[in-house]
Amino acid sequence: MKRIAVLTSGGDAPGMNAAIRAVVRKAISEGMEVYGINRGYAGMVDGDIFPLGSKEVGDKISRGGTFLYSARYPEFAQLEGQLAGIEQLKKHGIEGVVVIGGDGSYHGAMRLTEHGFPAVGIPGTIDNDIAGTDYTIGFDTAVNTAVEAIDKLRDTSSSHGRTFVVEVMGRNAGDIALWAGIASGADQIIVPEEEFDIHKVVSTIKDDFENRGKNHHIIVLAEGVMSGEAFAQQLKEAGDESDLRVTNLGHILRGGSPTARDRVIASWMGAHAVELLKEGKGGLAVGIHNEELVESPILGSAEDGALFSLTDEGNIVVNNPHKARLDYAALNRSLAQ
């Protein structure tokens, strides 16, 4: 394989630029040419394809977002869109593609592979909801951004004796809420993987203020459960009388310079994706397991998800065997500040 392309698709994630940089530099070192595709699959179909060299990826490792831009392109789910994209790739002499993104992006890569066009996936999403990897690119940065924000919210919460509901991203997976909540010492964490009793939530708030002598209460809520405003309304209807505020961290979690960890794993996975294409291997997704590079069928990575579930005892049972187990219940309460 002499010429490959790289694209980013779906929601952006800090560290995507580091992965693109690694793909380009590794490919050049292997004597391969690299082309960039702007705007993901939309740019592929439109022929928005151009050469990438070391100069184009210089100084990109510290930048958030993706300089190749990103877009959601549902038309690529249709055969017509897939064939149009492959036609453009062949027109530019491209023999394989590295796709950086989440589950929707993986489905596109899977379709390319089914048509006999080699594609390798790199997990780039802050939600950490891709199977076959312990961590996705952008997750660590998003968690650190959330923790920094929650720490600041605790300051103002303590000053006024308030309850704060902090809504974070995570439509189908509560990983950001779980990790950020534990790291910030949140008092309660509400995730899609666990059913909650709103009356118990209210009782815990009351106990903290009246019996434990606390002057704040922080609840981290994954957006996949419901909106922060809707959750606050349920709290009030269930009898919560605390001075309640809602903050939605929203898209701020997608921005910012990637952490050292995100830069490193993005670089590892980007280089490994090139190695797989050089060997003629398509239909695979790259991942990190126990700090080592792994690969798995892209079909499974796209379909299985990486969601965890919680037992009655509060233990996390991970559907993705490449993810760690945590004692959720113990950490959630014993580490709350």
Swiss-Prot record:
Keywords associated with the record: Allosteric enzyme, ATP-binding, Cytoplasm, Glycolysis, Kinase, Magnesium, Metal-binding, Nucleotide-binding, Transferase
Recorded catalytic activity of this chain's protein: beta-D-fructose 6-phosphate + ATP = beta-D-fructose 1,6-bisphosphate + ADP + H(+)
ATP-binding in keyword set: yes
Binding-site residues for Mg(2+), renumbered to this chain: D103
GO cellular component, one term: 6-phosphofructokinase complex
PANTHER family: ATP-DEPENDENT 6-PHOSPHOFRUCTOKINASE (PTHR13697:SF4), PHOSPHOFRUCTOKINASE (PTHR13697)
Name listed for the protein in its UniProt record: ATP-dependent 6-phosphofructokinase
Annotated organism of origin: Streptococcus equi subsp. zooepidemicus (strain MGCS10565)
